[in-house]
Amino acid sequence: MTGKLIWLMGPSGSGKDSLLAELRLREQTQLLVAHRYITRDASAGSENHIALSEQEFFTRAGQNLLALSWHANGLYYGVGVEIDLWLHAGFDVLVNGSRAHLPQARARYQSALLPICLQVSPEILRQRLENRGRENASEINARLVRAARYTPQDCHTLNNDGSLCQSVDTLLTLIHQKEKHHACL
């Protein structure tokens, strides 16, 4: 593989969807943002995803059309094998990944994987979760506990407390630094 798979992770409310949406607006000739296949309605949530029924999801998984897949929060998530074609063509591919399923991504993509974990201060995370209005107070507290408890090992961290523009710039800098390092090996 000549491209890098950027596995972007972070707790709910950390700003992954906003970061990806902003990144899609910028011209990137060698960076593609992959859509996830999810068993939820297309209009649910803020993520730009491809909605599948469970039957459609299992059919695709059974036909080996998903490079990676997992179950979380009562839904099935997957990333299509098209990302492998993009990587082999030399593109870097950014995926909205799962912290719990990072080992699966590491096993498949090994040295081509660039894991990045968004970090957000508890105060900012609480504010974002409250503002989006999807969870009640006890669910927000549970998400805050889960966010504080789990940060994957051996990941690059990206603080997302600041402006969206600043976070995208920092993400792109991190990706390009890793490309230069990879090219020098």
From Swiss-Prot:
ATP binds at G10, P11, S12, G13, S14, G15, K16, D17. GO terms for molecular function: ATP binding; ribose 1,5-bisphosphate phosphokinase activity. Keywords: ATP-binding, Nucleotide-binding, Transferase. Its EC number is 2.7.4.23. Pathway: Metabolic intermediate biosynthesis; 5-phospho-alpha-D-ribose 1-diphosphate biosynthesis; 5-phospho-alpha-D-ribose 1-diphosphate from D-ribose 5-phosphate (route II): step 3/3. It comes from the Bacteria. GO terms for biological process: 5-phosphoribose 1-diphosphate biosynthetic process; organic phosphonate metabolic process. It holds the Pfam family AAA_18. Signal peptide: none annotated. Catalyzes the phosphorylation of ribose 1,5-bisphosphate to 5-phospho-D-ribosyl alpha-1-diphosphate (PRPP). HAMAP family: PhnN. Belongs to the ribose 1,5-bisphosphokinase family. This is Ribose 1,5-bisphosphate phosphokinase PhnN. The gene is phnN.
